[in-house]
């Protein structure tokens, strides 16, 4: 019997089957793995295709972007050129400005130096002015003190001027009184002259009456009385002569007494007026009283003159009161001029 190779292979079949089964299982596993890998690859491919699509889109966008970028680059280049040109112009302008600023800075530096010198000079001037102000303040203080002293002096001077004004008024009033007195004295002088003429006629009449009385007495007396009279004829005859001689002496004495009394009265009036200026500033009523007093004082002098007959003519002495009263008129005018000047100064 002939054995074929297949008979030889039959016992090996189970092993082959097992091996094949194992191989199939392994293959199935491998196939599964391959399918898995294929699915993963497909998935990856889809992803990659998608990514490729995105890349294509991005490439197109990039192309578009590149084109726009090129346009932008060109624009930027143009702008860069323009900016370069502008920068050049700006640089030139800046250089010019720098030159100008440098020149200005030099000028400012010069002005600053000049101002510094002026500030130093002015500071010195300010110091000098401060020192002058201090000296002026001291002078002002001294001047204020002097002003106070001058103010006090001016007050005193004003008080003196007021007193002088009142004194001027008193002096004017005294001058008026003196003029009135001069007029009154002139009137009294005229009256005295008239009275002297009347007294001469009265004295003549008195002499005649005395002689008549004596003759009548001597005629009416008895003879024994005549013996007595004849024993002392000088005593009987002397009285008329003595009386006649005494009468001129008494009249002469009465005249200087009257003039002296008038001078004393005028001096007393003036002294009272000068000693008490308040009393001299009287009213017109006081003037009337003084006039009435003087008129009352004058008649007794006339009466005494009439009681004492004067055979000779009465020679009136020069009016000393008039001379005394006329003399103060000149100082009055000078005093009025001084008062007017003081009023102008005020």
Curated annotation (Swiss-Prot):
Alphabetical list of InterPro entries matching this protein: Luzp2
Species of provenance: Pongo abelii
Record's compositionally biased regions (Low complexity): 250-261
Transmembrane spans: none
Protein name: Leucine zipper protein 2
Glycan attachment points: 133, 264, 302
Predominant cellular place of this UniProt entry's protein: secreted
Chain segments annotated as coiled-coil in the UniProt record: 16-211
Biased segments, Polar residues type: 262-283
Keywords, ordered alphabetically: Coiled coil, Glycoprotein, Secreted, Signal
Leader peptide range in chain numbering: 1-19
Region Leucine-zipper, annotated ranges: 164-192
Keyword Cell membrane annotated: no
Residues covered by region (Disordered): 225-346
Subcellular location: Secreted
A Gene Ontology term for the protein's cellular component: extracellular region
Sequence ranges of Basic and acidic residues compositional bias: 286-298
């Amino acid at each position: 019997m002939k054995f074929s190779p297949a008979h030889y292979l039959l016992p090996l079949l189970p092993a082959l089957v097992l091996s094949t089964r194992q191989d199939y299982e392994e293959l199935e596993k491998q196939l599964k793995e391959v399918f898995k890998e294929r699915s993963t690859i497909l998935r990856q491919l889809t992803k990659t295709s998608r990514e490729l699509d995105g890349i294509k889109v991005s490439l197109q966008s990039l192309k578009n972007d590149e084109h726009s970028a090129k346009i932008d680059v060109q624009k930027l280049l143009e702008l860069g050129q323009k900016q370069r040109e502008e920068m050049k112009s700006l640089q030139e302008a800046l250089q010019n400005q720098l030159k100008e600023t440098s020149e200005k800075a030099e000028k400012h530096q010069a002005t600053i130096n000049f101002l510094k010198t002026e500030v130093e000079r002015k500071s010195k001037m300010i110091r000098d002015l401060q020192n002058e102000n201090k000296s002026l303040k001291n002078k002002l203080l001294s001047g204020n003190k002097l002003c106070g002293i001058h103010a006090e002096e001016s007050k005193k001077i004003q008080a003196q001027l007021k007193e002088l004004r009142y004194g001027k008024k008193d002096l004017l009033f005294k001058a008026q009184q003196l003029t009135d007195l001069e007029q009154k004295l002139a009137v009294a002088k005229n009256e005295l002259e008239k009275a002297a003429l009347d007294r001469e006629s009265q004295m003549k009449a008195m002499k005649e009456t005395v002689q008549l009385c004596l003759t009548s007495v001597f005629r009416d007396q008895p003879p024994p009385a005549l013996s007595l009279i004849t024993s002392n004829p000088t005593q009987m005859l002397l009285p008329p002569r003595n009386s006649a001689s005494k009468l001129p002496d008494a009249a002469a004495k009465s005249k200087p007494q009257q003039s002296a009394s008038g001078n004393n009265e005028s001096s007393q009036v003036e002294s009272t007026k000068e000693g008490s200026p308040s009393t001299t500033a009287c009213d017109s009523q006081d003037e009337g009283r003084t006039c009435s007093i003087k008129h009352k004082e004058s008649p007794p002098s006339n009466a005494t003159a009439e009681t004492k007959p004067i055979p000779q003519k009465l020679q009136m002495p020069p009016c000393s009161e008039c001379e005394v009263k006329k003399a103060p008129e000149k100082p009055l005018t000078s005093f009025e001029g001084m008062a007017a000047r003081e009023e102008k100064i005020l």
